Amino acid sequence: MAAARPFLKMHGAGNDFVVLDARAHPLDLAPAAAARIADRHRGVGCDQIILIERDDGAAAFMRILNADGSESGACGNATRCVAALLAGETGARRLTIRTNAGLLPAEIKGPTLVEVDMGAPKLGWEDIPLAEPADTLSLRLALGPVQNPAACSMGNPHATFFVDDLTHLQIETIGPKLEHARLFPERANIGFARIDAPDRIRLRVWERGAGLTLACGSGACAALVNAHRRGLAARRAEIEMDGGTLTLTWRDDGHVLMEGPVALVFEGELDAAMLAP
């Protein structure tokens, strides 16, 4: 049985994480253990579990496990949190973190403010991926009051529905059905965006493997990209989510920059039973 391990509870704009440092002592966390830790009633509770691992070509490798135990390629809010931790160790203002989605450069902007270069979105249907060829600017997909989302990949698949009313939208009902739609062979993160101004977007996200979260960094990136592609938003906008606001910039070179807050909530220890497969 695995030994007890220290952890940090962190969040970025309310998107919360259990962070485990596995650089000195590697940890092979089974999906069942990840789901146990993420349980908000019987575990610590979080949207994702983050494992910080050694990497010879970057400051660290960041492994991301969703609340259901599945693995994710990218998480912008978690990247900011890990960047802040690593910068605190070394004093570096700029560093690069490797994820399954690639290398993500980060810059410390303030004591609790971090910017991450999330890379360039992938817009081809096969890159998201979709189950069949389709125009990713307007998918033939509808459920209840929402229809025809735009899709892209920010290291993980995203579909963004543009709506006029977020208040009465039953996201807990339609979110899981859209996540598992046949069009998305790897499932998808589902965003619901209301355009308040060309530089202001209100967003709620049903995250693949995590459900409705207070914030989703890659979802915010996808919302800006898809809104700009539709002619609904500028290349720079404030993305307001339930847990806070992120500042997004889609640069002319194609890269998306995401700036937002990070916070350390508390420290603790996971016992061996919690870590067991």
From Swiss-Prot:
Catalytic activity, reaction form: (2S,6S)-2,6-diaminopimelate = meso-2,6-diaminopimelate
Enzyme Commission identifier(s): 5.1.1.7
Organism, as annotated: Acidiphilium cryptum (strain JF-5)
InterPro entries associated with the record: DAP_epimerase_AS, DAP_epimerase_DapF
Transmembrane intervals: none
Recorded metabolic or biological pathway in which this protein acts: Amino-acid biosynthesis; L-lysine biosynthesis via DAP pathway; DL-2,6-diaminopimelate from LL-2,6-diaminopimelate: step 1/1
Binding site for substrate: 15, 48, 66, 76-77, 156, 189, 207-208, 217-218
Protein name: Diaminopimelate epimerase
Encoding gene per record: dapF
